[in-house]
């Protein structure tokens, strides 16, 4: 079995935050808040939370807070539910939720919920299961789940439930690993997991493991290291992690590491990025790989954080 290149990954994480003299850094303004979450989670999972620059990160996140109560990806951009949940998750990790008006953020989120229970990503109206999950995740962290119309939210989530046991991004859409995570985790947070067939769901997820040990997002697709989180977390939520080959998946994930520069890629020998680094490490955490911080499969937050917040 390959080894986890811990020191390489720590150096990689420090390096990606200091590339301000590179054009690529500025071309990815739309990913800055997301990248902060992925980086902070990676530091936590590697048991190096003390190396997170808390003051710098909190200051930047506050510069992304808009008058509406939501967060933008970068100062001057529009707010969006995805940036809002990532910002709130980071503030929770850094024990800094007190710097925002929780009621105002919660009101912003509820303003995105539609009458049918779904949730818009922003004022422009795009609807997606990921957005509803993000709102539920965020409200739970803020202690404001009572703001949510839970009945309509659950009804809409169940409309995304498919005959094969999986979930799509909207009613009638094909089952997909990432949507399975968002819907299953949302139902778990809302204590409504009894509405689904866990045996059928476990079958659908276990079918995502392919030759070589990796997981894909849907049938006939290539494996990708990020599905070590998206597929595995709902399997953890329903208590069926033993339905996949643990050792083969670990070998696949470790095989996507860059032995020279650190970081994880989607597949072996591809370019690394902080997104795949975060979710590969989160997957290894669910697999109880040695010396990695335990993760909460509902929130993709360190278990220490969610336990402290009594989530």
UniProtKB/Swiss-Prot annotation:
How the cofactor is bound: the record states:
Binds 1 zinc ion per subunit.
Keyword Transferase found = yes
- Which cysteines link up through disulfide bonds? none
UniProt EC number? 2.5.1.60
Alphabetic keyword roster: Metal-binding, Prenyltransferase, Repeat, Transferase, Zinc
Database matches in Pfam families: Prenyltrans
Q: Which cofactor does it need?
A: Zn(2+)
Instruction: Please tell me where geranylgeranyl diphosphate binds in this chain.
Output: 176-178, 218-230
InterPro entries, per the entry: PGGT1B-like, Prenyltrans, Ptb1, Terpenoid_cyclase/PrenylTrfase
Q: What does this protein do?
A: Catalyzes the transfer of a geranyl-geranyl moiety from geranyl-geranyl pyrophosphate to proteins having the C-terminal -XCC or -XCXC, where both cysteines may become modified.
Describe its assembly.
Answer: Heterodimer of an alpha and a beta subunit.
Q: What is this protein called?
A: Geranylgeranyl transferase type-2 subunit beta
Protein source organism:
Schizosaccharomyces pombe (strain 972 / ATCC 24843)
């Amino acid at each position: 079995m390959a080894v986890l290149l811990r020191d390489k990954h720590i150096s990689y994480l420090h390096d990606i935050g200091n590339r301000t003299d590179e054009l690529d850094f500025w071309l990815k303004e739309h990913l800055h808040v997301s990248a902060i979450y992925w980086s902070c989670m990676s530091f936590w999972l590697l048991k190096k939370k003390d190396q997170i620059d808390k003051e710098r990160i909190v200051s930047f996140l506050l510069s992304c807070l808009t008058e509406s109560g939501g967060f933008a990806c970068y100062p001057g951009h529009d707010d969006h539910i995805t940036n809002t949940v990532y910002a709130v998750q980071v503030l929770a990790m850094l024990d800094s939720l007190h710097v925002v008006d929780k009621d105002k953020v919660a009101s912003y989120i509820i303003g995105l919920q539609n009458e049918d229970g779904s949730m818009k990503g922003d004022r422009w109206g795009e609807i997606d299961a990921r957005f509803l999950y993000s709102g539920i995740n965020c409200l739970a962290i803020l202690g404001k789940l009572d703001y949510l119309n839970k009945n309509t939210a659950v009804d809409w989530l169940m409309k995304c439930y498919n005959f094969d046991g999986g979930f799509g991004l909207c009613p009638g859409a094909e089952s997909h690993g990432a949507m399975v995570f968002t819907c299953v985790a949302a139902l778990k947070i809302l204590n409504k997991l009894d509405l689904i067939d866990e045996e059928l769901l476990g079958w659908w997820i276990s079918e995502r493991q392919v030759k070589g040990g990796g997981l894909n997002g849907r049938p006939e697709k290539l494996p990708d290291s990020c599905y070590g989180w998206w597929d595995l977390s709902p399997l953890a939520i329903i208590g069926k992690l033993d339905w996949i080959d643990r050792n083969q998946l670990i070998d696949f994930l470790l095989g996507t590491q860059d032995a020279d520069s650190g970081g994880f890629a989607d597949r072996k020998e591809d370019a690394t990025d902080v997104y795949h680094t975060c979710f590969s490490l989160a997957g290894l955490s669910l697999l109880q790989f040695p010396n990695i911080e335990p993760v909460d499969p509902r929130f993709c937050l360190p278990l220490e954080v969610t336990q402290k917040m009594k989530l």
